[in-house]
Amino acid sequence: MSRELQDVDLAEVKPLVEKGETITGLLQEFDVQEQDIETLHGSIHVTLCGTPKGNRPVILTYHDIGMNHKTCYNPLFNSEDMQEITQHFAVCHVDAPGQQDGAASFPTGYMYPSMDQLAEMLPGVLQQFGLKSIIGMGTGAGAYILTRFALNNPEMVEGLVLINVNPCAEGWMDWAASKISGWTQALPDMVVSHLFGKEEMQNNVEVVHAYRHHVMNDMNPGNLQLFINAYNGRRDLEIERPMPGAHTVTLQCPALLVVGDSSPAVDAVVECNSKLDPTKTTLLKMADCGGLPQISQPAKLAEAFKYFVQGMGYMPSASMTRLMRSRTASGSSVTSLEGARSRSHTSEGTRSRSHTSEGTRLDIIPNSGGPGSSAGPNSTEVSC
């Protein structure tokens, strides 16, 4: 893409988890169930917030390495903008084995599930709670797991929000580098370098320090290392952008790919975008944002998520957000991410802009998603 994306004026920086914050405090108006569920590949810790509503999907989250569902998603689900969404959907938070708060160490010789096996554990979670389908939200390793789950069980997944997703296996040079890093770096430093770019580590010292402290003091180091090893041993997802007359494997559901413009995962997310169906995929690049948009800019991510589920046909009567009201007042025809997706066949020079009173802008930029794809429809890239 030749056109440079613009930064926004508004930047939010919040701690990973406020002091004393708990998941029950987050969603105190909803029932909260915590269970350890036995699956094909062992036990998994799950927290269900709210009551599933008929045939409506639940929002199922999966966290990245070095995190659990609280540190990965509390700032997002605690934001005011997310409350309207959680009134319409129950939320099911999944913690990878041994990553939940207070997790005991695995016994010597324990074989940690592979990434494929972690995905194969999720049908058992849905069965336990009587759930028919989900809207998945995954970050990093969790995004990979949910993508694998959707490829294996397309009938169970209505949509995916994938933050910092990497569809590729770790190359042998990356593998060697991670091995050497494991010999020379402390575990917290390895995880921090996975989540934060160099610029972010220099400019957001307080957030990075808080996260390093969390890894050192709140995570079980042995369990965390096993999860990291599983992620580093992942297979390529082997997905391809569908072409007329060709039999290809890719996601069947709508997907919203999210990445901060200074995230270390930018290249991987763009690569994933090039492998998905452009008529069902939107790439959201968040300006002035690093590796954890759900933590640094939860309000903007909640707004994008709201447009995403509205595009799927849910929450049609939901109140308009500040950005939506600004678009309406200015006469913009762009009303949702799904609406933008349906208009992605315009020329490369087309750009729709909306300005809010706070200075936040969302740009819709038709994007081919990669070289060699000009013969087919374009996916939509959004910058906010």
Curated annotation (Swiss-Prot):
Sequence ranges of the Sequence repeats: 339-348, 349-358
Keyword entries, A-Z: Acetylation, Cell membrane, Cytoplasm, Cytoskeleton, Membrane, Microtubule, Nucleus, Phosphoprotein, Repeat
Tagged with keyword Membrane: yes
Modification sites for Phosphoserine: S2, S319, S326, S330, S332, S333, S336, S342, S352
Superkingdom field: Eukaryota
Main location, first listed in the record: cytoplasm
Compositionally skewed regions (Low complexity) per UniProt: 374-384
Region feature 2 X 10 AA tandem repeats of G-[PST]-R-S-R-S-H-T-S-E, mapped onto this chain: 339-358
Phosphothreonine: modified positions: T328, T335, T346, T356
Cysteines engaged in disulfide bonds, as pairs: none
Modification type N-acetylserine: residues: S2
The keyword Cell membrane is annotated on this UniProt entry: yes
Modification(s) after translation: Under stress conditions, phosphorylated in the C-terminal on many serine and threonine residues. Phosphorylated in vitro by PKA. Phosphorylation enhanced by increased intracellular cAMP levels. Homocysteine induces dephosphorylation. Phosphorylation by SGK1 is cell cycle dependent.
Transmembrane parts of this sequence: none
GO BP terms: signal transduction
Region (Disordered): 325-384
GO cellular component terms given for this protein: centrosome; cytoplasm; cytosol; microtubule; nucleus; plasma membrane
Bias (Basic and acidic residues) ranges: 345-361
Biased segments, Polar residues type: 327-336
Task performed by this protein: Stress-responsive protein involved in hormone responses, cell growth, and differentiation. Acts as a tumor suppressor in many cell types. Necessary but not sufficient for p53/TP53-mediated caspase activation and apoptosis. Has a role in cell trafficking notably of the Schwann cell and is necessary for the maintenance and development of the peripheral nerve myelin sheath. Required for vesicular recycling of CDH1 and TF. May also function in lipid trafficking. Protects cells from spindle disruption damage. Functions in p53/TP53-dependent mitotic spindle checkpoint.
Family, similarity comment: Belongs to the NDRG family.
Subunit structure: Interacts with RAB4A (membrane-bound form); the interaction involves NDRG1 in vesicular recycling of CDH1. Interacts with APOA1, APOA2, PRA1 and RTN1.
Protein name from the UniProt record: Protein NDRG1
Gene: NDRG1
